[in-house]
UniProtKB/Swiss-Prot annotation:
InterPro entries: DNA_primase_lsu_euk/arc, DNA_primase_lsu_PriL. One of its GO terms (molecular function) is DNA-directed RNA polymerase activity. This is DNA primase large subunit PriL. Residues 338-358 have a biased composition (Acidic residues). Heterodimer of a small subunit (PriS) and a large subunit (PriL). Keywords: 4Fe-4S, DNA replication, Iron, Iron-sulfur, Metal-binding, Primosome. It comes from Haloarcula marismortui (strain ATCC 43049 / DSM 3752 / JCM 8966 / VKM B-1809). Binds 1 [4Fe-4S] cluster. One of its GO terms (biological process) is DNA replication, synthesis of primer. [4Fe-4S] cluster binds at C234, C306, C315, C322. Residues 335-358 are annotated as: Disordered. Belongs to the eukaryotic-type primase large subunit family. One of its GO terms (cellular component) is primosome complex. The keyword Iron applies. The gene is priL.
Length: 358
């Protein structure tokens, strides 16, 4: 196990180093608290601040913490956790390889083994898809589309890129960003996976700690986008009932109200939405929403999980994504992630434009 393996644990040769050492993962989680603690730190830091924490000074601990972290992510089995973890690992690798790429040849000869761009391209079968273009690089359009699909901003759209003979011109920095995306794909690949009971039992405390972090964290703090067509089926149904003026049971009103608060709607906006409902009372509705938000109570309430929605009969019209998601907010976040930013039209903006036209 070499330092480079620990810095880039997703590499094939890093995985081979672990296999060559005949490491028993079950024994590791049962007896090596240092590795388990570092694995927990990787995942918890990814959730809370988008990093993988500080690397451990011992190469063995740092490297083995990676597969254990993947086990923890699989046991938690929440989309937001998986996404944040993969992104954090990719960001950490990006910071390391961009620094190493920038290191001069002279310095490399006297320092530790480093990763170069050629090896990283080969790792993801991109060596034949990327060629030097003097002041930048050319990337085959298929590879480019795959790696640029999740990038934000017009500059990444194929229509805005120089395209010649099926190849897209990119700068060195842009190629590094595409490589970061390839790493994120590699980390995400296979997650979550089935974990043997013997290993899962040893990690019960760590999984509970991560679940507590997830429950306390305001995972939707960055969401301020209201796109009803991307709502989970349960919330679409409840919103439809509200807009049709149908009566909602208390638990149903609570569910849709917490969801709307969670995605960034203000109290006034939610009150306006509920005005068509026969059970509407502005003062009571405003109080309930402010109470949910934590303005009039010591507790900020979150949207019920799918299991709770099912128990109250509010879970309807399940689709394929529902099968893989355990929380309505996770469903909505994934839908937002999967939709091109230019296609996201906030419902509140539409309402404002209609009022202006009127």
């Amino acid at each position: 196990m070499e330092p480079l393996h620990a810095r880039y644990p997703f590499l094939a040769r890093s995985r081979e180093a672990v296999e060559a050492a005949a490491v028993d993962l079950g024994e590791i989680v049962a007896t090596d608290e240092t590795v388990t603690a570092r694995a927990l730190e990787r995942v918890e830091s990814a959730i809370t601040d988008g990093t993988v924490g500080e690397p451990h000074r011992r190469t063995r601990v740092e490297l083995l913490s990676y597969p254990v972290a993947r086990v923890l992510v699989s046991l938690v089995d929440v989309h937001i956790c998986t996404r944040k973890y993969a992104q954090a690992e990719a960001e950490a690798a990006y910071d390391r390889f961009t620094e190493e790429f920038a290191t001069t040849t002279e310095l490399k000869s006297t320092q530790r083994e480093t990763l170069d761009r050629t090896e990283l391209l080969g790792e993801f079968d991109l060596a034949s898809a990327v060629s030097d273009a003097g002041d930048g690089y050319r990337v085959e359009v298929g590879a480019y589309l795959d790696l640029a699909a999740d990038q934000r901003g017009d500059s990444w759209r194929l229509v805005n890129r120089p395209l010649t003979d099926g190849e897209v011109r990119v700068t060195a920095e842009e190629l590094n960003v595409l490589l970061k995306q390839a790493i994120r794909h590699r980390v995400t690949d296979g997650l979550p996976f089935t974990v043997p009971d013997a290993i899962a039992d040893e990690l019960t405390a760590e999984v509970e700690q991560l679940e507590e972090v997830l429950s306390e964290l305001e995972l939707t703090r960055e969401i301020d986008t209201v796109v009803p067509e991307l709502f989970p089926p349960c919330m679409k149904s409840l919103l439809d009932q509200v807009q049709k003026g149908e009566h909602l049971e208390h638990h149903s009103r609570f569910a849709i109200a917490t969801f709307l608060v969670g995605i960034g709607m203000t109290t006034d906006e939610i009150v306006d939405l509920f005005q068509v409902n026969p059970g509407f009372g502005e003062e009571a509705t405003r109080y309930q929403v402010d109470h949910i938000r934590g303005d009039t109570s010591p507790t900020e309430y979150s949207t019920p999980a799918c299991s709770t929605m099912q128990s109250y009969g509010d879970c309807v019209n399940m689709d394929d994504l529902c099968e893989a998601i355990s929380h309505p907010m996770g469903y909505y976040e994934q839908k937002l992630d999967d939709t091109d930013e230019e296609e996201l039209v906030d419902w509140r903006e539409d309402e404002g434009e209609e009022e202006a036209d009127a």
